[in-house]
């Protein structure tokens, strides 16, 4: 498959994989801001990320990648910040300094404390080193540890969403992680009532509903 495209076309292009929580974050941001984009699937199971053409777009061979004219951006956080700078409505960061810091903290916990411990590249590396039971324990421990920190961080400042009654940056990172906890990893959410409540709130929003893994162009017919 060729991933080389005309960078000078106006329409945004998102290189994505349906189950990637990192790509999921960007899909929410694009939809929340009402931006039209072309979805270009990168099948991580088949190794499309190692394709030489795709690596011209992202030398790391990961998703997501965003192409905006002659601009190419990799990494979900960088992409979302770029979109928020270029398309500032609705804003993804609150004006309140404390709430802004909480958004950054929650985002960091997801990016560094949870997601890296459960991604496909890691488990491919560990495939012959741990069994299925150990893999499940690894994932559960990483998510539980991160969710415990998030619950404590957000319980006192949360409204309908992570830092109030408006959707901000933290919500874009929390939603995919909580969705995966419920639907993919089957984590017991009883110890995390605040996060479970967010999940219900996110499911009411079209931008979040349309971004879920189960509704993407490359979602398999059977999961």
Swiss-Prot record:
GO process terms (BP): aromatic amino acid metabolic process; toxin catabolic process
Protein name per UniProt: Glutathione S-transferase Z2
Top-level taxon: Eukaryota
Keywords: Cytoplasm, Detoxification, Transferase
Enzyme class: transferase
Annotated Pfam families: GST_C_3 (PF14497), GST_N_2 (PF13409)
UniProt-annotated location(s): Cytoplasm, Cytosol
Job of this protein: May be involved in the conjugation of reduced glutathione to a wide number of exogenous and endogenous hydrophobic electrophiles and have a detoxification role against certain herbicides.
UniProt xrefs under InterPro entries: Glutathione-S-Trfase_C-like (IPR010987), Glutathione-S-Trfase_C_sf (IPR036282), Glutathione_S-Trfase (IPR040079), Glutathione_S-Trfase_N (IPR004045), GST_C (IPR004046), GST_Zeta (IPR005955), GST_Zeta_C (IPR034330), GST_Zeta_N (IPR034333)
NCBIfam families referenced in this protein's UniProt entry, alphabetically: maiA
């Amino acid at each position: 498959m060729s991933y080389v495209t005309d960078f000078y076309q106006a329409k945004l292009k998102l290189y994505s994989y349906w189950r990637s929580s990192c790509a999921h974050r960007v899909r929410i941001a694009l939809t929340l801001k009402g931006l039209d984009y072309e979805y270009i699937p990168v099948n991580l199971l088949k190794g499309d990320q190692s394709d030489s053409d795709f690596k011209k777009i992202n030398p790391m061979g990961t998703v997501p990648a965003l192409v905006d004219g002659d601009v190419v951006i990799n990494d979900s956080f960088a992409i979302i910040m770029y979109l928020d700078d270029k398309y500032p409505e609705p804003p993804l960061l609150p004006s309140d300094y404390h709430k802004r810091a909480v958004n950054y903290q929650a985002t960091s916990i997801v990016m560094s404390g949870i997601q890296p411990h459960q991604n496909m590249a890691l488990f491919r590396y560990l495939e012959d080193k741990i069994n299925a039971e150990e893999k499940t324990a690894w994932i559960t421990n990483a998510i539980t540890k991160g969710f415990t920190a998030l619950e404590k961080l957000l319980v006192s400042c949360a409204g309908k969403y992570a830092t109030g009654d408006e959707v901000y940056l933290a919500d874009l990172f929390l939603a995919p992680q909580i969705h995966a906890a419920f639907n993919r990893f089957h984590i017991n959410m009883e110890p995390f009532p605040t996060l479970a409540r967010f999940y219900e709130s996110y499911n009411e929003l079209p931008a979040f509903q349309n971004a879920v893994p189960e509704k993407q162009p490359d979602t398999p017919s059977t999961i």
